[in-house]
Amino acid sequence: SSDVCSSDLEMDTYASSQRITVTNERSHLIMGFIDVIKERAKSSIKTIVLPETEDMRTLEAADKILKEGIAKLVLVGNEEAVKKSAAEGGFDISGAQIVDPATSEKTQGYIDKLVELRQKKGMTPEQAKEILLNQYLYYGVMMVKMGDADGMVSGACHSTADTLRPCLQILKTKPGTKLVSAFFLIIVPDCEYGANGAFVFGDSGLNQNPNPEELAAIAASSAESFKLLVQEEPVVAMLSHSTKGSAKHADVDKVVEATKIAKEQNPDLALDGEFQLDAAIVPSVGASKAPGSPVAGKANVLIFPDLDAGNIGYKLAQRLAKAEAYGPITQGIAKPVNDLSRGCSADDIVGVVAITSVQCQAQD
């Protein structure tokens, strides 16, 4: 009977997928992409901490993540309060582990470890206890540090700085990584550019005005992230308002220098610059503005010269091209911890948890 069931299911799935394609081409492409990431997350289940249990979007996302079997979840908070909120919202979080810092037997060990880690900064046991009992972000990061969880997703009601501060203090950077940076995974519907509309935009979330060395590091990390998540070869363009010397300015010089450093450090990477955006992604423009470049017109990883450009760039794609923008996704932290945009939906949280799980798998 299982054969009948599975083929029925396949027919149903096929019919519904055809329906989606006909009614909403855009949602089919995007769902297709995030569905692949979800399936990869399910292939080796990871434990992800969600510390923002006071936010209904977190609880709604938890319900969806557990129903779909994307990850094991740890929710940080007072058990009674979390369960009450979930019940009020009609969300089933029975499959999640709820950890209350005030009653968990692990808390004392976390306090001791935090004091040890922050000793040079003069942290006392009283201060550590105060932080861990009241700031669930810190508690979540300590769970990851101590191996009680694989990764964390937060930021629905905290700023990027608040989310990343405990990570940098406690988890530090990944071995061999000079810089923590952030990228957005951008999926543009009906788009012939990039990898069928998939791009990584970096740094669009963290580093304000990177110098050439930092820009080169962002390029290398972003290429690695693209390969991990999109599973295609990265083609990296260093963006500017100039293409191959068409404009002269100190800002252009920075990108030229960064391109040189990135090429020296990553000789096997398809990387070039400096490019205007059209020269980077449109084949005909790339061919005329930068003939002979292996990257011009083919880029799928776009490295912006500073945070202004990167942030404006991803929001333009999101709002005008109706792209899905997942992120800011961090790269370079010793363990995967990801930020959310404060305007995120529950589905955005589900997507970022799946992405975080895939990043955790890559560390195995």
Which residue ranges define each predicted feature?
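Anion-binding alpha/beta catalytic cores of soluble intermediary-metabolism enzymes, centered on
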Residues: 30-296, 301-364
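Compositionally biased, low-complexity intrinsically disordered regions
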Residues: 6, 15-17
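Residue-level detector of intrinsically disordered terminal segments
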Residues: 10, 29-30
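Short hydrophobic alpha-helical segments enriched in small aliphatic residues
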Residues: 13-15, 25
